[in-house]
Amino acid sequence: MIGLQSLNHTYQRYRTLQTHRISALPIVILMPHSACNCRCVMCDIWKDNKNLKQLTEQDISGLLASLKQFGTKQVVMSGGEALLNKNFFRLCEILNGAGIKVSLLTTGLTIKNHAEQLLKWVSDIIVSIDGDQPLHDAIRNIPGAFNKLKDGVGYIKSVNPNYRITARTVIHRLNFWNWIPVINEAKQMGIDQVSFLPADVSSHAFNRQMAWEEPKQHEILLSEHELPELKTI
């Protein structure tokens, strides 16, 4: 029976890729809270913190039938900062009750405060690291952000060393030379894996009301003369 379900789900995923109709969504990304507790230089989400939007228990419960229909196995809670939603763990409980795993993408500022609940309701955590301590704090415009992240990761790992915590780093002209320190810091924290992605400077992502003008893009985008240095890292 399980084999037939798996085969059907694989077919539905294939069908989704081959047509313009969604038949399968194994992973769904939700934004429980639109505001953020960082002020990152490469992101505009925090600039709209006053216009708060957040998901409720009713919102999540209302999605369950569709998630079941599309064969969803995992929900990634993104943001903004998902942990700013006061009912965040109730949302996770509803999803877990439907057999759906929850992953959390977070700034990491408050994971120590929520460690017990995270270990209970969230399958894994993905934190953001932008550099070593001074650079991370500067890019996020939050003094002490790095140490709060480090303390949170360390505490959770001390409770459950096998709990999976990974990191992602957005690479841009302010931190590309700090690539190796990022890896070293992640190792020292006990983070299981680090992934890297380039900064998006030209789309409407990250709550941009309009695409950045070229002068703003060049504050974040690597210049041509910096590429040789990037290749040496």
Regions found by a protein language model. Give the residues of each.
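Conserved alpha-helical substructure of the radical SAM core
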Residues: I2-D124, H218, L222-E226, L230
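Radical SAM enzyme [4Fe-4S]-AdoMet core and its adjacent flexible, acidic
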Residues: A98, W121-D124, S128-D130, P134-I233
